[in-house]
Amino acid sequence: MVQSKLINLDEIILTRTVNEFTTTLGIDSFAHCQDRDHYNSYTKFIVYKFNELGYRDEEWPENIDNCVWAIGDSFTVGIGQPFEETWPQLVQTKLQTRVINISMNGASATWIARRAKFIIDNFNPKTILIQWSYVHRREDPDASKLDEDRALPVDPLDVADFENLTANIMLVESIKLSTVVIHSFIPKFFDGENDLPKATVLYNMLDTSNILYFPPPDQADVARDGYHYDILTSTHYANSYVNLL
C-alpha cells in the first residue's frame, strides 16, 4: 500500500477483524442462522478473510488511482456469501477494475458517510459505490469507542432516522468534488411498511437533485445465513451499479 503510507489509516481500521480468517461469522453460523435446514443444505464454500485494515477484501494494491470504492454494511461485506459472489467482486469482474470494499457489519448511515468522506478527502477517487443500510441504524457520537461498538439501540418510531439518512446522502454529495458517486440501498432499508412513503419522498428528492441512484431490488434469494441476499440479488446490484457508470 505505497500510496497509503503517507496517510494515517488508523481512523478506518476495524480492530476486531484485522487479518481475521474464519468460516463462520455472526449470524452466518449454525448456532445463529435464521434457518438451520437452509444452512445445512447450502453447498457453496464460504471463508471470511479480512485484510490488514479489518475489511473482507484483498490487501490494497500498490496504486489505487483508478480503483472503484464500495461502501456498505453486512450485505456489502457479503455475510453468508462466498467472497467472489459479493456485489463488489461482481462489479470488479464486470469492469475489470479493482474494487476496494470498505464495509462493516452493522454499519449506519453516519458510518458510511464518514468512510466516504475519508476516502474522498484522502484519495480523491474516480468512483464510489454506496449501498446504504437500514434507516433506523444510528451511531453513538462517542468517537473514543471502536466503530464496531458505536451502534445505538434501534427506535423504529424515531422520525429523525429518516432525516439522518437524507442528511448523510447529501453530505456525501456536497463533498464529492469530481468523484462519481452512485447510491443504492439494501432491500427493505426502510425497515417497515410505515416508512414506505418516506422512501418515495427520498427517491423524489434524489431525482430532483439529479443524484445518481437506483432503488433496491426485491430480494430474490437468501445467503447461507438465511437472512442476507445471495448471488441472484448481488448480481442485480452489480449490474445496476455498472449500468450507471
What are these regions (language model features)?
Residues 77-80, 108-110, 135-141, 188-194:
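Short catalytic/ligand-binding loop motif for oxyanion handling, primarily in non-cytosolic enzymes
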Residues 71, 131, 182-183:
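Short hydrophobic segments within beta-strands
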Residues 47-105, 110, 118, 230, ...:
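Serine-esterase "nucleophile elbow" of acetyl-processing enzymes
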Residues 113-124:
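Short, well-structured alpha-helical segments in soluble
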Residues 74-79, 102-104, 135, 147-166, ...:
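Surface-exposed cleft-lining segments at the edges of enzyme active sites
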Residues 1-69, 122-126, 132-155, 191-192, ...:
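N-terminal secretory targeting modules
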Residues 138-177, 182-191:
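A conserved mid-domain beta-alpha-beta active-site/ligand-binding segment of alpha/beta enzyme cores
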Residues 185-245:
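Catalytic His-Asp segment of secreted/periplasmic serine-dependent ester chemistry enzymes
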